[in-house]
Regions:
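Residues immediately flanking
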Residues: 61, 115, 150-151, 168
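Accessory nucleic acid-recognition modules appended to NTPase machines
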Residues: 1-112, 117
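Generic recognition of well-ordered alpha-helical segments
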Residues: 83, 132-135, 168-171
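Generic alpha-helical secondary structure signal
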Residues: 6, 22, 74, 124-127, ...
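Domain-level recognition of nuclease-like catalytic cores that cleave nucleotide substrates
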Residues: 151-181
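Conserved beta-strand termini and adjacent loop/short-helix elements that scaffold enzyme active sites
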Residues: 40, 96-98, 148-150, 166-168
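Catalytic cores of nucleic-acid endonucleases
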Residues: 117-163
C-alpha cells in the first residue's frame, strides 16, 4: 500500500520515537539515493498524486526482516518488485490504484500482477484478488492477469477472465532476457 510521509511519521511516533515529518522525508530520500529503496508510481493517478504517493520497496528483501516480525508476504511482494524492475526498469513498472488495487502493472506488456502467499485454499483472498482483475478490465480490457504465490499453481477463470496462478520460484525461472541498456 502506498505510504505517505505523514503516515510513516505517525507510525514511528506511535512506536515511541520522537521524529518530525521533514526528518522522515530526509531519511527516505537518503535511502532512495543510496539505492536501499526504490519507488513505484501509480499508473492510474494524475501527475501530482503520482509524485506524492509512491509505493516503496527495498532493494534487499532481508531489510524487511529487520523491521517486520511476520514478513513473508511483504518479502514476496518485494521480491516480485525487484524482479520486475530487473526485467523492465523502474520507469516501466507501476502499481495501479483507481477504485482498483493491482500490486504491479507493466503497460508495455499489459501485464497485471497480484502477489499473495496463497489463494487456492483461502476463498476470501482468492475472491479479493480476482475481483480486482475484473475491475481492472474496465480500464484495460486486454490485460494479462497473473497471481504470484509462494507455491501454488493453477489457472482460474473469473468474470470471463483467465488468471494464471504461478509460484514465485517458477515465475523467477521463466525470467526473460534482460534488455540491453
Amino acid at each position: 500500500k502506498p505510504l505517505s510521509f505523514s503516515r510513516l511519521t505517525n507510525i514511528l511516533k506511535s512506536a515511541g520515537t520522537s521524529i518530525g515529518k521533514q526528518t522522515v522525508i530526509n531519511y527516505v530520500e537518503y535511502m532512495t539515493d543510496s539505492y536501499l529503496l526504490f519507488t513505484l508510481q501509480n499508473y492510474a493517478a494524475k501527475l501530482v498524486k503520482k509524485e506524492t504517493s509512491p509505493k516503496y520497496y527495498f532493494m534487499d528483501t532481508g531489510l524487511l526482516g529487520l523491521m517486520l516480525l511476520d514478513c513473508k508476504s511483504a518479502q514476496l511482494e518485494n521480491l516480485v518488485a525487484i524482479e520486475l524492475i530487473r526485467r523492465y526498469g523502474t520507469e516501466n513498472v507501476f502499481y495501479f490504484e483507481n477504485n482498483v488495487e493491482i500490486d504491479f502493472y507493466v503497460p508495455s506488456e499489459k501485464l497485471a500482477i497480484q502477489v499473495s502467499m496463497q489463494i487456492l485454499d483461502d476463498i476470501d483472498t482468492r475472491e479479493r484478488e480476482t475481483r480486482e482483475f475484473v475491475k481492472l478490465r474496465n480500464f484495460i480490457p486486454d490485460s494479462k492477469c497473473v497471481i504470484i504465490t509462494s507455491s501454488e499453481e493453477a489457472s482460474l477463470t473469473c468474470g470471463g477472465i483467465l488468471i494464471s496462478v504461478i509460484p514465485a520460484w517458477k515465475w523467477l525461472l521463466e525470467s526473460p532476457e534482460i534488455p540491453a541498456k
